[in-house]
Every structure is written in structure tokens, then in C-alpha cells.
């Protein structure tokens, strides 16, 4: 499974990249706005740090506007992936952009049929939102499992990005379900490698070694 970092914080991206865990980055208008810097400046800096795909989202709602924006975004760096909302106009834009060789990430997917439509239109990535489905009492993980099955059934090339990941369980279940990618907020990463029993074990090892060293010294 590939890990994308769901943030536009350059310091956060640098810190987690040093661990060798970042395969790509996803952003959206909300995330970009939090940085208080020009959109282009932020995306270009992220692309200079991360070799993998960096998703940058269009703002327009009509296909022509999305395509126009996407062409500009794609010129910012070779690893830019254009994020497109899951709408009829979005599908039209994806179809056009795919023909031009511009990679796309169709976002805000909540049903298998939406994911299938995006994949058929030529999306490079499709992003089902787990946490938001859970928020309305639906099991988002069922969507991941069923989407993976449908893509495999028909040999569709789109990769599933498990998005709106809220906790470790989301990540682990998405991995078990065969999602290609998980995009994870920076705040969740430390919880993925930490466990109180690990800390307790290290403490015990050090305590035993200290006792052994003192004994040897005597």
C-alpha cells in the first residue's frame, strides 16, 4: 500500500518524508487556505520535496473551466495530479484531460457507481471518503471493498485512494480490503507507529541492560 500525506504543510511533509513513508501528497482548497500562501507557490514547493503524485484541486464547476484550470496546474510540475469533483461536468473534464495525458484524481466519491463512472471516464485515481460515510451511519469500508472488486472485475486501471481517514482502524481495514493508497493526515501518522506496549518493552529492555551493565562493572 502507498501512503499519501493529506496536507499542504511543507514542514509536516519534510518531517514525515524523512521516514521514507510519503509516496505522494493530496491537497484541497480547505487545506491550501490554511497555509495562508499563494496556491501555486505551495504546490510547487511540495512538488520539489515529493517525487510522487501531488494532487491539486480545480475550483471551477463547469467542464470547460475545469479543463482550463487543469492545464495550468499540470504545467506547475510534472508530478501534479489534477483533482476533479465527482460530477457530470467533472466526468466530462476527466475524459478530456485523460486524452491529453493529464493525470486526474476524482474526489468526493461515496458510491460504487460514482467510482465506476470515474474509472470509466479515465481517472488515474478515485478517492472514496471513508470518514464522511461513517459520519452519516454508513460503513465506508464496504465501499472500498466493493470498489476494489468492481475495478478488478473489469480490469479498470484507476487506483483507489482511501480518503477521509480518521483513525488507525480505517487505514488497517483499507489495506486489508486492497485499497492501493491511503491518504493520511499528518496528525495520524505518529499513531501508526506508536503503541504503549512498544514503549513499555523498550523501557524494560533498557532497565534490564542497565542492571546487567552495573553487574558487569562490579
Curated annotation (Swiss-Prot):
Q: Which GO terms describe its molecular function?
A: aldehyde-lyase activity; transaldolase activity
Q: If you read the UniProt record, what top EC class would you report for this enzyme, in one word?
A: transferase
CC annotations in GO: cytoplasm
Annotated pathway, please?
Carbohydrate degradation; pentose phosphate pathway; D-glyceraldehyde 3-phosphate and beta-D-fructose 6-phosphate from D-ribose 5-phosphate and D-xylulose 5-phosphate (non-oxidative stage): step 2/3
Compartment(s) of residence: Cytoplasm
Q: Which domain of life is it from?
A: Bacteria
In the UniProt entry, which residues are flagged as the active site?
A: 83 (schiff-base intermediate with substrate)
A family per Pfam: TAL_FSA
UniProtKB keywords: Cytoplasm, Pentose shunt, Schiff base, Transferase
Which PROSITE patterns does the protein's record reference?
TRANSALDOLASE_1, TRANSALDOLASE_2
Which Gene3D superfamilies does this one have?
Aldolase class I (3.20.20.70)
Q: Which InterPro entries match?
A: Aldolase_TIM, TAL/FSA, Transaldolase_3B, Transaldolase_3B/F6P_aldolase, Transaldolase_AS, TSA/FSA_arc/bac
Q: What is its main location?
A: cytoplasm
Quote the HAMAP family the UniProt record gives: Transaldolase_3b
Q: What is this protein called?
A: Probable transaldolase 2
Gene that this sequence comes from = tal2
Amino acid at each position: 500500500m502507498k501512503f499519501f500525506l493529506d496536507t499542504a504543510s511543507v514542514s509536516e511533509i519534510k518531517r514525515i518524508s524523512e521516514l521514507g513513508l510519503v509516496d505522494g501528497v493530496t491537497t484541497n482548497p480547505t487545506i491550501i487556505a490554511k497555509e495562508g500562501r499563494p496556491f501555486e507557490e505551495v504546490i510547487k514547493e511540495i512538488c520539489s520535496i515529493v517525487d510522487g503524485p501531488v494532487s491539486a484541486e480545480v475550483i471551477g464547476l463547469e467542464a470547460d473551466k475545469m479543463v482550463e484550470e487543469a492545464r495550468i496546474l499540470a504545467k506547475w510540475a510534472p508530478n501534479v495530479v489534477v483533482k476533479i469533483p465527482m460530477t457530470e461536468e467533472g466526468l466530462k473534464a476527466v475524459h478530456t484531460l485523460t486524452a491529453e495525458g493529464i493525470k486526474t484524481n476524482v474526489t468526493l466519491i461515496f458510491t460504487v457507481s460514482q467510482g465506476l463512472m470515474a474509472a470509466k471516464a479515465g481517472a488515474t485515481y478515485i478517492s472514496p471518503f471513508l470518514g464522511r460515510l461513517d459520519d452519516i451511519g454508513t460503513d465506508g469500508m464496504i465501499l472500498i471493498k466493493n470498489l476494489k472488486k468492481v475495478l478488478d472485475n473489469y480490469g479498470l486501471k484507476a487506483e483507489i485512494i482511501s480518503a477521509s481517514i480518521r483513525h488507525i482502524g480505517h487505514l488497517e481495514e483499507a489495506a486489508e480490503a486492497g485499497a492501493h493508497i491511503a491518504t493520511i493526515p499528518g496528525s495520524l501518522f505518529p499513531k501508526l507507529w506508536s503503541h504503549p506496549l512498544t514503549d513499555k518493552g523498550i523501557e524494560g529492555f533498557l532497565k534490564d541492560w542497565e542492571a546487567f551493565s552495573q553487574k558487569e562493572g562490579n
